[in-house]
């Protein structure tokens, strides 16, 4: 059992950004294991998923949110509503801006959603995909962008979640923004997501990646049966894909 320090901190951090800017990959890197599915296809994340990071002096609950975008469908509208609801109850916000894409109207819209947040950081993601001089120019551009929309930013951190480059630094900077509090979850868990939900998400990830041309992106997976195989350390799972 870990003894918590007097100044132990705990709280929630929302990770937001446009679709496909590396939010889910970053959550997995921060937590240290895969709890969120990832895909090159937009809006793979449907529900806010909480990753729990427990350290001797803090516990951080990172909330992976669906990508914020101009909705064209009812699903898109509902995903945006989920993000707005989560922003109201977090202690800090991390905006993800990819190093290999231009800053656009979507990023401006997202930034304006958190103008009233006192603790905002920006992660310039996917730094492994650009050259050093391009990254330096992007960091300057991001700073100017934040100032232009009136966003007060505590830190701008370039990271590569894929290579886990500067993710430890980002984690420590986010931890500084948390309030003093005892841990909110048991220290031995890394997500509050039920095992069955994790399994359905992994199946959905495989379906999206392998059947993207054949099935709609709005597929839903349900578990029909899950039984532990006798004498083995794995389960037999029967699931249904609803399209």
Language-model segments: what does each one mean?
Residues 188-243:
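Long, well-ordered amphipathic alpha-helical subdomains in the mid-to-C-terminal portions
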Residues 54-59, 78-154, 227-231:
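Conserved C-terminal guanine-recognition region of P-loop GTPase G domains, centered on the G4
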Residues 1-92, 97, 239-242:
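Conserved G1/Walker A P-loop phosphate-binding module
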Residues 33, 52-56, 71, 86-93, ...:
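Conserved, well-folded catalytic cores of nucleic-acid-processing
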Residues 118-121, 128-195:
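Canonical P-loop GTPase G-domain recognition
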Residues 14, 28, 47, 51, ...:
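Solvent-exposed alpha-helical segments within well-ordered globular domains of core cellular machineries
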Residues 42-44, 66-69, 99-103, 127-130, ...:
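Conserved nucleotide-binding/hydrolysis micro-motifs of P-loop NTPases
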Residues 10, 117, 126, 216, ...:
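A general secondary-structure signal for short beta-strands and their flanking turns/coil
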